Amino acid sequence: MSEFIAFVAEKSGIKKPNLIEKDLIIHRILRDIYSSRHFAENYLFKGGSCLVKCYFGYYRFSVDLDLTWQAQEVWAGLGKYELRRCLLEEIGNFGSSLEKIAQDAGLEFKNELKSKKYFEFGGGSRMVTFKLWKDSELIKIQVNFVDEILFPDKTITVKTLLENVQLSRDDTAYFEEALEFYRPFKVKVYDEKEILCEKVRAILTRRTQKLRDFYDLFMLYKSGYKIEALKEQIIVKIKACLHYRRYRANLERNRKSLEFSAVTEDPFERELFVTKPPKDFDAFLERLPGALREIMNQV
């Protein structure tokens, strides 16, 4: 693996081996998830990882995966206990497949729903974080099983750091096994507008904001997707998550004080950046609190 990491670093021109390794791992996990027909048909790829690997290219690294169950209609009309039973059945199916995927990738994960080491539940099992481990390093796969999906999904190719790199025949032969899992493939994904709505929701319902979310919003803004144009949809998204107690508490906390200064200097978050944000990123950050407060005032 270390030799292939060095190869990707050389070919991509990005000298961040630890983050390259993380990209190889999450790419393999995602590919293996979507190699299952059931998962490929029923789960949508989303979030910052989706923006990087499907839409805008590697302006930053991602260190986790976010998915949503697409067929929300299957939960409609179910009572509280029947819904929980059905959710736990699907969570168990996903966890069982993930256990094999993790084993094949040399990661630690056990499909033990009662284990806090491997599972974190929210909202009566409506949202689950599956926690995979590479030694002491955590790789999170967060799945929203119940949520509002407002825009039609798309089918897009998941790219790698070797996109647009011409590989020689010798390179292809030498790294044949690694290139077999680190190659492009197609997935169903969230529309950019849906991702923007959830990015704003994440910022407003987290106890601590993350600089990567601001950079993602900036990239969406530069591509023509603006918070002001999607206020109604963002509010719908926020209201859909308010049955999570901690999100309600965080929203109230952020309503009283929305402070970005400490976030923008976080060295870990800065290390995720592949390219330094342009100067207008700072101007974007200065305008952002006003737009966010306007939304909070309407929730």
Q: Could you say what each language-model-derived stretch is?
A:
Residues 45-49:
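Glycine-rich beta-strand-to-loop/alpha-helix junction loops that act as flexible
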